[in-house]
């Protein structure tokens, strides 16, 4: 799947309350920043009542992303604010028909383990070539950490936080590099290209 200009598309569907989305967003921001630039990212935390709770993260809602290599379309479907009328969370963004069709087709068995896992988030669609559904690493690694602590830990490659976030970011980068023909070289390094073989 490409956009009108022929650039490959990455589509993300998640929600602000979701702790697994909270964890995945860190890796997505690291990976996507290798190909382009974000603006308007805002801090948010996952639900205080979910497990793990209160994960410090960013929201893609209200942000923009520019890249000459790919198009990134994020959809944050719900906030982290409980909605007593539904027992869920308040609606934030509604997926388009096309985005909902991707979720319905690909976020279901056999791409998830069972029917009760259908619709799992985070859901990341890499241009019709790859899927990432659910958590890529243990979100509890981020439990109790504030944004500045996580950012600081990312500068220490031996920290559990950096290993989890950057390790996942490298796999996301590898998937994107497969779609961009290994461009740019600054992102699609030899290490990343070796990861492409495992996708």
Model-derived features: where do they sit?
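Non-globular targeting/processing and membrane-anchoring segments
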Residues: 1-9, 23, 30-199
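Short glycine-rich or small-residue beta-strand-to-loop segments that form or flank ligand, phosphate
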Residues: 9-15
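Conserved redox-active cysteine motifs that mediate thiol-disulfide chemistry
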Residues: 15-26
């Amino acid at each position: 799947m490409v956009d009108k200009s022929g650039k490959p598309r990455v589509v993300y569907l998640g929600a602000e309350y979701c702790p697994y989305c909270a964890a995945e967003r860190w890796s997505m921001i690291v990976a996507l920043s290798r190909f382009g630039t974000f603006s308007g990212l805002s801090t948010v935390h996952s639900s205080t009542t979910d497990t793990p709770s209160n994960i410090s993260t960013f929201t893609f809602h209200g942000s923009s992303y520019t890249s000459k290599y790919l198009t990134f379309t994020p959809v944050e479907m719900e906030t982290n604010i409980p909605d007593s009328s539904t027992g869920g969370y308040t609606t934030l963004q509604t997926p388009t028909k096309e985005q909902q069709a991707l979720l319905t087709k690909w976020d279901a068995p056999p791409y998830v383990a069972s029917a009760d896992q259908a619709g799992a988030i985070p859901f990341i669609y890499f241009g019709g070539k790859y899927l990432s559904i659910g958590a890529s690493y243990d979100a509890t690694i981020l439990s109790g950490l504030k944004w500045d602590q996580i950012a600081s830990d990312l500068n220490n490659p031996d920290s559990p936080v950096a290993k989890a976030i950057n390790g996942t970011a490298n796999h996301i980068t590898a998937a994107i590099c497969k779609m961009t023909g290994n461009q740019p070289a600054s992102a699609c390094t030899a290490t990343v290209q070796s990861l492409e073989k495992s996708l």
